[in-house]
């Protein structure tokens, strides 16, 4: 998925909404826009794997939004989303070789920093302030996020 997203020409700078352009980050909207059916299909397959691996305790696989974002050095993006109270976010890295201890790029939520490891996902209320933590390398951090219906 990371390789396909790197090759995509569908990146936008819409997020976080309401922030000046200089504070926005690159993102591909897969659902509902669905401009890239290959990436969207892979993303839905991944979400079902997350659901089967234990996500069913926290969410229904009813997707309201799915996107891939890229973050790098100098991207400081604390923000809140504006989803309904029945929505949670599922977030994970697409970089298979990302090493948080060496390069940073974790996840800050509710005042606590989390180490995002490749193949691991975090489920959270995105209506609370959250952001990527400082990245210490020129390498880009790719992440996929889903807005889904909370159980």
What residue spans do the PLM features occupy?
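Non-heme Fe(II)/2-oxoglutarate
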Residues: 1-58
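Catalytic core of non-heme Fe(II) oxygenases with the double-stranded beta-helix
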Residues: 52-151
